Amino acid sequence: MKEGSVMTEILAIDDDRGILEVIRRALSREGYHVTTLDDPQKLDESQLPRYQLILLDVMMPGMDGFQLCRKIRDRVDCPILFLTAKTDEKDLMEGLGIGGDDYITKPFGIGELRARVSAHIRRENRERKHNAV
């Protein structure tokens, strides 16, 4: 969150609570405020506009990350990054085709997670600054 004084809000959704805790700790140390959900059904869609970035696990029981992305993409303009163990080109193309902005392959390193999140946040901040001029 080195780009400004307003705390950047990130939403992470994954059915694995251990991964959510790793994400929360890693990104909180960078100054981000991270909200975690272990079930996409618990998402309060009225809160979506507050997030500047969303991390979505692809493979979750009930509603998977692709289904959730399709459901919310037209209501959010922030980056959506998929977390997945799926590495097929078909899955990658599907995720990007439905509105995902990037993929982070599991298992992922903390450095990669922080770098990708930071890069997307920086780009969003540049676009907002440019559009405000």
Where are the language model's segments positioned?
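Active-site residues of response regulator receiver
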Residues: D14, D57, T84
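C-terminal output helix
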Residues: F108-I121
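Acidic, metal-coordinating helix/loop segments flanking the phosphotransfer/catalytic sites
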Residues: T36-L53
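Short, Lys/Arg-enriched segments at the junction into DNA-binding effector domains
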Residues: E9, A119-V133
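The feature encodes the CheY-like receiver
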Residues: L20, P61, D88, K106
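Acidic catalytic/metal-coordinating carboxylates
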Residues: D38-D39, D64-Q67
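Conserved acidic segment of CheY-like receiver
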Residues: M7-G18, I23-L27, I54
